[in-house]
Every structure is written in structure tokens, then in C-alpha cells.
Amino acid sequence: MPRKGNGQLPLPDGWEEARDYDGKVFYIDHNSRQTSWIDPRDRLTKPLSFADCVGNELPWGWESSYDPQIGVYFINHINQTTQIEDPRKLWRNEQERMLKDYLMVAQDALSTQKELYHIKEQRLALALDEYVRLNDAYKEKSSSRTSLFSGSSSSTKYDPDILKAEISTTKVRVKKLKRELSQMKQELLYKEQGFETLQRIDQKMSGGQSGYELREAKDILSELKSIRKAISTGEKEKQDLMQSLVKLKERFHLEEARGRSEPDLRSNLANSHLSLSRQTLDAGSQTDISGDIGVRSRSNLAEKVRLSLQYEEAKRSMANLKIELAKLDSEAWPGALDVEKEKLMLINEKEELLKELQFVTTRRRTQGEIERLEGERRRLEEELLSVKSSPSKALAEQLKIQEKKKELVKKLEEVTKSATYLHSQLKSLSASTLSVSSGSSIGSLASSRGSLNTSSRGSLNSLSSTDLYYNQNEPAADLDYQYKLDFLLQEKSGYIPCGPITTIHENEVVHCHERIDYTNSPTAQQDTQDAKPPKSVTSLSSLSSLSSLSPPGSPPVLEGVFSLCTQDSLRTGFEISELPESFADMNLHENLQLMESVAGESQALAERKSTGEGLRHQSSASQEGRTDIEFPRKNPDRVQEEKAMCVSAAVSDESVAGDSGVYEPSVKPPGEDPVFNDDYSILGAAQAQLILRYDSGNSSFVIIIVKARNNLSYVQFGSRIYFRVAVLPSSNDTSCLFRTKVYPATESVLFNELFRVSISQTTLQQKTLRVDMCSVGKTHREDCLAGTQISLADFSFSNDVHTQWYTLLPSRTIPLHKEQLEKSVLSASNTQTAALDLDAVSALLERTSAELEAVEQELAQEDDDQEQLCPGDDWPEMAPEESFSTLEEHEADLLLSGEYYAVPLQLSSETTEKSEELYGETSNWDSVVSPLPQAELPTLVDKETNTEEALQENLSVRPKERANLGSRQRPFVRNSMIVRSQTFSPGEKNQYICRLNRSDSDSSTLAKKSPFIRNANERRSLRVKRPICQPMTRRTVHECRERTSLDLELDLQASLTRQSRLNDELQSLRDLKQRLEEMKARGETELPTCVLEDERFQRLLKQAEKQAEQSKEEQKQGLNAEKLMRKASKDVCRLREQSQKVPLQVQSFREKITYFTRAKISIPSLSADDV
């Protein structure tokens, strides 16, 4: 076919080109009198199939078009169909594959949680039955009271004090199991529904089914719009119901307050008048302002500068936190780590059930019931023995990363709120726009165009809040489960019946309304502050919008990417030298290090033979405590005070006095009884190593049983023993009795089991800690072999860790073995062999304590001498040239190659426009590399060049520049000071970074000479605003916007799921409101027990009260902070895409499909009746 003059092929004969009323081109075939959208010449010029296409070509018969509501869609003129998927790409197939893979993961997780629910049901049924039987036993035994160390009975199961503690602990366990089962039932229902929804979507959208056409996609978007309106209406109703609950709660409190006496009311009224008059006086003084207007304007300017600096620091902190979050390794599936947690918790629940079956009461049980329980116990033990997979170190590291991620998210939320508040303050100070440093020009966070609410093209974030790093309604972690999981991770070889299983009798020792999140503890905040990257030099000049910490053209340093302090906070191994810090904050990621260190210490002790060792091995707790762990140094003046507390009870009036909660044994001076100079441990007394600490942050008393030795002195070889710990007298609302795992007795046994008792300091001082070594037989009756009592009246509440060996005195007379008699004869030095007198035993213990005191004083003196010789930190500072040597090899290569020097937030054109309106003029977030784990605060300098000589001594060096440093050169740094006399010197001077103003930007120079490159960025004037990778950014955003029919179906089903769950929440709030109104109508003045004891109801009411107290301005700030937080979450995803090469669309799709099976119950249903 001949071509026209312009090279275009002519139309065939009988064909004509025309345009419709929309301006779209179509073709008329006059031969057949038909019209067609397809150019007849395309058959000759375009590929006929997708396999022949090159680049972005479409084959013959296909056309791409754009719809304002849907976006880009594709038309198949041959089949006369439309579709929203790009036929050239395989993203839809990849989505279907990921959905099928996740269905397998979700099915496994669902079966695990069902089994966990079934085990909890068994535990609840057993606990209810045990509670009834213990109550009956207490009623029968209440008339007869036996001594704790009475030798008349072989069992202390029905000792009144122990029995009362058993009853209260069982009661607390029943309540907790009821609440957990109620919550798990609702979560299981949601997860089953979500799993079924995903199955329906998979069946509908796979198997050769075609996607949605343009008309169907528009119908789905219209339905989505109506559902979101309904959700918005439901959210408003939810807020109204919560406010109603707050008013009802206040009415209950008012009814309680009316019972007070009239004088109290008068005094309160007088106080209110005083406070009112004072407020009126203050208000009057504020209106009568006198002074010069110029002074006020200068003060306002100073306040603006102060707020702007704080605003800059908040922005910089946000950038640092985003980078740190992006550096953390992401999970293969969101929530995949939760599945591993549930598997570990299933093992733990089985161990708890096995332990409860071991200690079940056989009283008034038939032989058939006993055999059934014994068969269940054997079956559980076989199941646990068959568990081959143990918690690996990799899983422990993932859990530590998850805890670090939670801490960073919490800090990011706080910084976001702070930035929003500072912006509002700046806005109120300035009548016009934000006239502060250009580095602070984030702009109005309340901009409607900058809103991050999800549009029709967005993800499900506005519906479900399932961002990778931001979930506002995520409940606080259960401390009991955190500790159980922590101990499970220490078992490196799975379930070992002959060793301790790191579980406690119930471990629900923290009362529900006294629990707080572990991240609120002071040490957790301190650790996160230590891990924070160093602050950059703050801008003080309003002309320095183009200033940076690097020369023109050099890539910006991402703050904290290779900060050593951050790397130190993410250690991959368990640091055994951090025991004091670990005990200062008992959370998951630090308890891992703690228990690892304790295990190392106890393992080292177990390898040592007890025979032939003298007094230091048997009685010096401080020396053995320093075997592998560096404990806090004790003040020698406090040693005598601690000795008055840490003693063992003897069979005397003092031991009986321990029952009353006040136990103060006499302390004799050293050397008072010279006849007992020999070590009592030679005589074979069993000992237990305990670690005690009071956690003032959580109001919890922490008890750790580390190990026991010389056990065979009280029990025959092959018997099964365990420890029983009780805090007496018992409390009705707190678990106070715990048991370790039963295991065969050996000479030395490692326990490493932790128990927590939620108790106040005042109450703890009235308690006595009782530790008993017991054995259990086939009759399930406890036989107390030996024990000790520790008075807590003088216990130190300074968060110090107290490690001590306690001698266990026998509860009844035990004949000495032949070998022990021979040792006692050889060591008695002309003393006749006779039965031990218990008063002599007490004297011997006091003698041992006195010698131990002298040893500890000597060690404390040595520590003081070492501190004088080596003041400062325990770890020496790192040399500058060694700072980068601690980095991993591949990270150093990335640093040098510039892979991490990409712009941290490369937004799309649309997002950039919104963010420019949201933030104003974007700014560079400066950063420096920290050479030390605890970096000093940088010196604030003016943006103009400095004329004084000020150079830092400790500097960080790039690895490749290390070899080029001469005697006259200093290493290249980002935070070095600028000296004008050296800025333009022709000779070889220090390398520097020039911070420039607009006035002298043309005089910029590079730190290093580079080869000549025409039109290089660094050779242009800094006044030119260079676009940063705009074409690539547009392509990236276009790919991320790509939407398939599967995405539309997921959006629709997620909206329906969110609406259904919101309706359930509304119904729960209506039921609770109705119940409170009925109670109020009956004249009751106290809230129901389920509201007072359930921590979820407490969080709900506190959240409602906080919202009720907020003003409109504060509510607006909260909404703006939430929007900014969502944007930060998206920025983290983009940074992760750059650093870890995880496509943003893959992250978004994974979040969508995991939303259905990750149910978080924010509003609980009314719990069952109490016991």
C-alpha cells in the first residue's frame, strides 16, 4: 500500500475517518455500511498478539482509555469488552497466587487458635471443679489449724494458709479464663467469617473468571461510597454512645459521693470558692496588661523562634523514626509472627493444663475420674514430648524486632502529636502564614486537600486501620502472655520433662485493672531515647532554605541509617551483661536477655561440683552472682539491713511469727558461737537461689527461682520434686500461690521460673514470702520436704535486684546419710557426733551470714577501688577510626556506594502536590552519623559561616577516606564547624561542609574534586530548584495506582466486614448502656463487676472520658495528628520499598487480605457472672 507524503499509510478504499460528539475517532466502512473503533491500518502496523508486543505496545484490537472515576482501563474491540486490568502485565496472576498462599497460612492459624480455645475450655472446667472442692476442704479444715512446719502430717495440702492462697488463686484464674474465652470466642467468630470471605473471593475471581468491566466497576464504587457513608454515621453514633456511658459513670460516682458527711461537703465547697476566686483574680490580672507594645512583639518573636526550633526538631525526629522503621525487617505476611506466637502459647497452655492435672485434688473423686484425669495427663505429656520444634533464636530475634517496632511506632505517634500541637501554637501566634524558618514550613496540617482519608482509589486504611505500623485501636499487650512467651523462648531444646518448663501455676498475677503497657516503664523509654539518632544542627536563619549538611550535589545523609547507637539497640544476641537494666524494665525484648543471662549463670554453676568447695561456694551469693552476670553494686552500709531481711527461718518462735507477715530474726555478731565455725552446707542442707525485685512502675513483686542444690539431702534419688511459692497472708483478688514444674530430683536443678504478684508497696511490707520444696506422688497430695520464710517488712523498693541463696530447713526430722555423717565427723574437730540441735543450726546460719557480710564488704571495697581507677562508663569509648569497623560489611558497602543516599520520601506528583499544600515548602531533614552508642548533643551553630576555630576531636570517618588522612588533615564530617578563613584557602586545609545562604550560594565548592561532567548538578547554581526524579516518580505512582478487579472485590468485602463489626460494637455499647441505666433505676450506686475488673472496659471508659474533656481545637489537632500519622505510615512503606526492594503494591495487597483474619476487639461484650 503506497504511503502518503508524510509517511502515513492511507485508508483502504471505501473507508472514512470521523469523530463522534465526544471527539473520539472512529472509522466508517462504506462497503459494508458499518462503523468500527479499530483503525483498519492497524492490522498491518500493530502486533497481532501480546507475545509480539514490544515495550508498552498493545496488540491489534486493544485500546487504553481513561475514566475520571476508575482511572485507566482497557478496551477489547474484538470481543467488545472492557476491563480495568492491564492485559500486558501479570500483576493479577500474582495477586491470585498470593491470595492462595495466604489462605493456607490463615487456615493453619485458625486451627491453632481453635485448639487453643479448646485447651482453655478444659482449663476453665478443671478450675471450676477445683474451686468447689477446695472450698469444701477449707470449710472442713477451718476448725483445725496445723503449724507450717509440723512433722505430724505428711502433707501440707490442707494447711489453712496454703489452702486460702490456693482458693484465691483458683478464683482469679477462673475469672481470667472466663474473660479470655469470651474474647477468644468473638475473635474466632470474626476470623472464621474473614476466612470464609477470602475463600469466596478466591473462588469468584480465580479459575479463568474474567474481571470486572467498566460498568460493573462503577457500580462497585457507588456501593463503596454508600457503605462508607453508613460507616461514618455509625462512627458518630459510637461516639455518642461512649459519651452517654461517661455521663452514666459520673452519675454512679455522684451517688457514691452523696454518702459523705456534711462537714466534708462544706470544706469542699469552701475550697471550691477559694479556687474560683483565685481563678477570677487570675483572669482579671490577665486582662489588665500594661507595658510597651514593642516588648510584647519581641517576646512574641522569641516565642515564635522557640516554637519553630521545637517544630524543626519534631520534624527531624519524625524523619529519623521513619527511617528506623523502614530499616527493620518486614514479615513475610503481616501477622505471620502472631501465628508463631499462638503456636508457642498453645504449647504453654498445654503445659499449664498438664501442671493443673498434676496437682488436681483427688478428694471425693471416684476411681474412674482419677483414672480419666491420669490418662489425660499422660496423653498431654506424650504430646509435649512429641513436639520437635523449639523456639529458635531467629524467632526470638523477630520478636525483639517486633517489640522495637512497637516502641518506634509509639514514639512516632507522640512526635506526631507534638508536631501538630506546635503547629497550632505557631499558627495562633502568627496572624498570617507560617513565617518561621523554611525548614519548619510543613504548613497547615489541617488542610482539607492534604487530608489522607482514603479516596476511591486508596487502600483500606480508612476502613480498618491496618497499616503496617499504625493501628490506633490495637489493645495493650497482656503482660501475662508476654512473660509466658518470653520464658518459652528460653527453652532451646523443646519440652524436657526432666527439667523445668518455664511456666508458672497460672501467671495471671497482674490484676486486670492494675496492668499498664510495658512500654510505659521508665527503662523502656530510656532505651528508646538512647537508640535515637543524634540531632542535627538546627537552623536559626530565615534565609537558609537551601542550606544542607552536605556540599551542593552530594546526596543527603539519611539520619540514623548507620547510627551505631541504633545498631546497638538492635543487637542480634542476648547480652548477658545487662541483667540490672533488664530487671529495671520487665518487658519482652529485655526479658529475653535477662533469662539468657540467668540461664548462663546457672549452667556454669551446675557444672561445678558441690563436694570439696568451702564457705565461699556455699554461702557467698554475691560471688556466684558475678559468675556470668554483673549485678548492681551494693552499698556496704546496706548489707546489714539486707541481711536482716534475707535469712532462712528456723524451727522456732521466729518461724511461726512469719505467718503473721512480720518476721524479724535476731542477728548475732560474727564469732559469737565459735563452736560452729564449719560450713553448714557440708552437713547437706538444701539451698535455693532466688532473685527478688519490686517493679514500682507496674506495682509488681517479681520472684525468680533460679536453681536449687543439695536436693538429695531431703529426698531419695529418683523422686519428683518442685517448688511452691506463696505470698502470705493471701489476698482475694490476686494470685499469690505458684508452683514450678515437677521433675526428677537430682543434686542440682536449674529452674529459671518467674512469678509476678500485683501488690502495692504498703501491702507487700505486711507479707511474708514462703518458699517450699515439695514432692508429689500418685495420690496427688503435696508433701512439703523443706522450706524457708522471708520477711518482706524491710524489703527495699529501690528497683534493685536482690540475689541470694536461701537455706531450706526441713519440715520434719530427716536422718543423715552415711556419707554426710562421715563428713560431719571429720569436720567437727574432736566434737562428739550427735543429732543436730535446731538452736545450733540457727547459730550456724547467723555465723554464715556474718561471714558472708564480710565477703560482700570486701567485694564492695574492691569495686569502689576499681571505679576510682577507671571512672566513667564500663565500656571504653570507641576510637574514631574504629567507629565504622563495627558496621557489617554489606552495610559499609551500601554506605559507600550511595544506595542509602536516596531521597527518603519520593512522593508521587499527586501526593507531592498534596504534601506541598500540607507541609508547604519541603525541606531536607539533616542527619549525622553517630560514632558512639551514646552520642553527645550537637552544638547549635548559626547558618552563617563561623569565624572562630572550633573543630571536634572525636570524628567519624568514612572507610575509604581512612587511608587518605594525613597528619594535617581531619576526617570528613557532616557536623564540622565552618571557619571563614579556611573556606576559600587555596592550600590543603581541613575538609569541610559549607552551609550556604541564598546570598552566597554561587561561591559553593565541593569537599572533593570530581571529574568534569557537563551540566552536572553540583556545577549549577543552588538558586535553581531542581526536580528530583519526577518522571521516575510518576511511573512509580502510576504502577502503585494500578487496580485490579481483585482489589475492587477486596475493597467491597472489607467495607462490608467493617460495617458488620461496627454494628456489633454499637450493639455492645447499647447493651452496656441499657444495663447501666437499669442498675441506676434500681438505685444501685456501684458499677457492675465486669466493668470494674475488665481492663478493656476500663480502657474504653478512659478513652471516652478523654474525648469528652477535649475541646474542639484539641479534637481538631487529634484528627490532624492522625492524618499525619497515616502519611508517615505510607512514607515508611515507600522507604521500605527503596531499601528492602519490597514493592509498595505488594505491601498494600498483603495488608488488604490479612485484614479479614486479624480481628481486634476494641469494645468487649458483657462478661459472664463472677464466681
Curated annotation (Swiss-Prot):
Localization terms from the record: Cytoplasm, Cytosol
Q: Which UniProt keywords apply?
A: Coiled coil, Cytoplasm, Repeat, Repressor, Transcription, Transcription regulation
Q: Which residues form the C2 domain?
A: 684-806
Q: Main site of residence?
A: cytoplasm
Disulfide bond residue pairs: none
Ranges annotated as biased composition (Low complexity): 534-551
What InterPro entries does this protein's entry cite?
Answer: C2_dom, C2_domain_sf, C2_WWC, WW_dom, WW_dom_sf, WWC/KIBRA_Hippo_Reg
Q: Does the keyword Cytoplasm apply?
A: yes
Domain WW, chain residue ranges per copy: 9-42, 56-89
Chain coiled-coil ranges: 120-193, 223-257, 301-420, 836-870, 1047-1123
Q: Which GO terms describe its cellular component?
A: cytosol
Annotated spans, Disordered:
521-552, 603-637
Biological process, per Gene Ontology: negative regulation of cell population proliferation
Q: Bias category Basic and acidic residues: which stretches?
A: 606-616, 625-637
Which SUPFAM superfamilies does the entry mention?
C2 domain (Calcium/lipid-binding domain, CaLB), WW domain
UniProt family annotation: Belongs to the WWC family.
Function description: Negative regulator of the Hippo signaling pathway, also known as the Salvador-Warts-Hippo (SWH) pathway.
Protein name in UniProt: Protein WWC2
What is this organism's lineage? Eukaryota, Metazoa, Chordata, Craniata, Vertebrata
